[in-house]
């Protein structure tokens, strides 16, 4: 699982892992699993029905670090520098949130950031991660409109400033909304190919969306949907 891969792989000197686990009203795990015996692991029980934004907020509030990384449980890391490379981007004060190159199980790109044109879509989905891409877009860190909540790093202070992840979204788009809220504070969303994270549950953006979620995203940030200052059509 992701916890084992983090502990075995990561070269970052000081980190904790907060595992948000689903429990029932009696405090019993809904989906039992075992974790390594490691003092860096903290459990945060979540006893509500599934709600991604609420779980993200719950995990962030249970953590203690100045920088927080949200990771889906269907991700996997195999490069020591995956964490240091995304956290390192936050040394730039105008960057609010950072994401890695997300990979499909076969090594192709799952997401190289998210474009808002013509509607929220994963950039370079299905393309080779071994290629530099059009104009080198796969080889350099750059600004994007948004990134996936499957893996994103941000400062706790900025999380608090924008009120965390909006819990008004039922299924999708709370991650994009978070990036938009940071942008409204003058903070950029960055993506770096120097950090690569597998996302086994990767799907086409919007494949499981709730229509009301998209309507809410459109009502809040519709002025940005349909245009993108950072993406090109063949990126």
Would you name each region that the model predicts?
Residues 21-32, 76:
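A conserved acidic beta->alpha catalytic loop
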Residues 14-24, 42-46:
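Short beta-strand/loop segment that forms part of the nucleotide-sugar
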Residues 46-63:
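Glycine-rich, basic loop-to-helix element that forms the pyrophosphate-binding segment
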Residues 4-14:
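Short, acidic, metal-binding catalytic loop of nucleotide-sugar glycosyltransferases
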Residues 68:
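Short aromatic/hydrophobic "clamp" motif used to bind/position activated sugar donors
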Residues 75, 79-118:
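Conserved donor NDP-sugar-binding/catalytic core segment of glycosyltransferases
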Residues 96, 106-107, 118-143, 148, ...:
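C-terminal, non-catalytic tails of nucleotide-sugar-dependent glycosyltransferases
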Residues 82-86, 138-163, 168-198:
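A short, conserved alpha-helix in the catalytic core of glycosyltransferases
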């Amino acid at each position: 699982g992701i916890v084992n891969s983090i502990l075995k792989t990561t070269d970052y000197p000081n980190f904790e892992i907060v595992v948000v686990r689903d429990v029932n009203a009696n405090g019993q795990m809904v989906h039992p699993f075992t974790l390594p015996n490691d003092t860096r692991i903290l459990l945060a029980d979540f006893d509500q029905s599934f709600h991604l934004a609420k779980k993200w907020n719950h995990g962030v509030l249970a953590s203690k670090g100045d920088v927080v990384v949200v990771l889906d449980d269907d991700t996997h890391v195999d490069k020591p520098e995956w964490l240091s490379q995304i956290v390192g981007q936050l040394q730039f004060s105008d960057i609010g949130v950072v994401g890695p190159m997300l990979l499909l199980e076969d090594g192709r790109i799952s997401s190289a950031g998210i474009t808002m044109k013509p509607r929220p879509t994963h950039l370079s989905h299905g393309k080779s991660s071994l290629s530099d891409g059009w104009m080198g877009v796969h080889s350099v860190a750059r600004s994007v409109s948004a990134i996936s909540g499957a893996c994103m790093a941000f400062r706790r202070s900025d999380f608090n400033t924008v009120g965390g992840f909006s819990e008004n979204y039922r299924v999708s788009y709370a991650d994009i909304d978070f990036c938009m809220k940071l942008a409204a504070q003058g903070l950029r969303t960055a993506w770096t190919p120097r950090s690569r994270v597998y996302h086994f549950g990767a799907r086409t953006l919007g494949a499981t969306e709730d229509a009301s979620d998209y309507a809410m995203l459109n009502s809040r940030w519709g002025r940005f949907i349909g245009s993108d200052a950072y993406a090109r059509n063949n990126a």
